[in-house]
C-alpha cells in the first residue's frame, strides 16, 4: 500500500485538495489549544489548518511523498508540523500525551485496525478528544473514493468496538457530498463521530 500512496502523492497537484475536511473544520473549535495528532495525514491539509489556528501539530503517514507535500504546504502557510514517516507502532509517541486525535479517512487493514485504534487511545490524555470521519461500508455503492475492500470500511458498531472507554458526543452514518480534490468527488457514505476518552 505504501507504493500506492507514494505514487498518488508524487503527483504535482494535491490529491485531496488544500482545504481542510469540512467535519473536522466544524469540530476543531471545541478543542482547547494543545497537542493534536493526525494519523495517516497524507498531504497535510488538515494538519496545516490546525497549525494555522495555533495548535501544536503532530502527524504521520507511511508515505514519504506525503510528507514532502505536507512540508511544502506548511512552508507556504508559514507554520510548523512535527511530521514523521512510518507506522504508528514504530514512532514511539508517549502515552497520555495528546489532547486530541484527528482521524480523517484513516483506513487501515482489518487485521490491524482494532489495535491501531486502541493504540491511539493510549496516546490520548484522559478527557482527550477524537474527531473521526471515514467511509462506511455503504460506500461500495458510490464512486466518490475510498477502499474497495469492505473490510477496510467502517460501521457504527465496529467503531464502538474499536474505541472502548470513550463517551461519544455524536456518532452517525451519513450520505454527504464530497468535494475534496481529485479523488473525493460526489456523493459518499461516511461514519462520523466526536468522542472523549473517559480515563
PLM regions: where:
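Conserved class I S-adenosyl-L-methionine
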Residues: 1-31
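Conserved SAM/SAH-binding beta-strand->alpha-helix loop
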Residues: 63-65
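Conserved SAM-binding strand-loop segment of SAM-dependent methyltransferases
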Residues: 77-89
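A short acidic, Gly/Pro-enriched loop at the edge of an enzyme's catalytic core
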Residues: 89-100
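A short SAM/SAH-binding and catalytic strip from SAM-dependent methyltransferases
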Residues: 99-114
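Conserved beta-strand signature within the Rossmann-like core of class I S-adenosyl-L-methionine
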Residues: 127-135
